[in-house]
Amino acid sequence: MRRQQERKSMPDAVKKVYLIHGWGANRHVFDDLMPRLPATWPVSAVDLPGHGDAPFAQPFDIEAAADAVAAQIDTPADILGWSLGGLVALYLAARHPDKVRSLCLTASFARLTADEDYPEGLAAPALGKMVGAFRTDYAKHIKQFLQLQLLHTPDADGIIGRILPDLARCGTPSALQEALDAAERADARHLLDKIDVPVLLVFGGKDAITPPRMGEYLHRRLKGSRLVVMEKAAHAPFLSHAEAFAALYRDFVEGVLDEPSGRTLAGLPPSCRTCRPTPDTRPQRAQTYPACRGGCGHQPQPAGETLSAGGI
């Protein structure tokens, strides 16, 4: 695991952001998102073992991948993980709580496959058939995957044109099968109660790989988390709805309080916003909030948010 394409910032910048990609991709999948984040933020996109330029020593191990990211972090950081990268981020936050200031999990999961205690999972994950296709012609099939995720996105061709050359240049990930096997075996549900940082969950309403019900499960289990479903997004909201996603993430990170509790006002229900008011300038969002955990005694509110403005 190595730190890659680090963007430098002002010397006094206090926020450090790490982006962790998903299965079958590499750090360049974030090439369209990074310029949309504040220029004062130091942002690093990393390659998971056996992806991009990162070497691969078998077996692919999620805990080891999380430890490798932690080794790069010298001060509590804001972590954004997509899909498999979100699973790695969960292990990172649970195993190295001193390294994580906040989490954003987009189109991710605590467990991928369903069982009798976890109906939110997939009955039969369909990613396996992509392994052979990626190995046969990675550039062709990663492009097709991106086109599917960006269906109906106005600037789809432009987005793909900006990220595909570097994404495809790295070639087929050497850990393709091993990383998929690890993702299908993984079960991070026992870690969720250990995570005590602000968490933003962003899911796509049309995502068939990690459907919104997986986000709802995480939202129930991660205390103080905030769930946002982008109704018309699929498995890559940060690509298909880049501006809205970047604004959402920017607001989240800026709202994280530098307090030991790590709580944010954004996670409080409307009644608690009366107790601790914060302006809401985005009435187009159909907002609901989780139960208050601040001890004020307010009753639980319906959970989750839906972004539907502007065709999102």
From Swiss-Prot:
Q: Main location per UniProt?
A: cytoplasm
Q: Which GO terms describe its cellular component?
A: cytoplasm; membrane
Q: Which GO terms describe its biological process?
A: biotin biosynthetic process
Q: Which InterPro entries match?
A: AB_hydrolase_1, AB_hydrolase_fold, AB_hydrolase_sf, BioH
* Function text: The physiological role of BioH is to remove the methyl group introduced by BioC when the pimeloyl moiety is complete. It allows to synthesize pimeloyl-ACP via the fatty acid synthetic pathway through the hydrolysis of the ester bonds of pimeloyl-ACP esters.
NCBIfam families documented for this protein: bioH (TIGR01738)
Q: What is this protein called?
A: Pimeloyl-[acyl-carrier protein] methyl ester esterase
- To which species is this protein native? Neisseria meningitidis serogroup A / serotype 4A (strain DSM 15465 / Z2491)
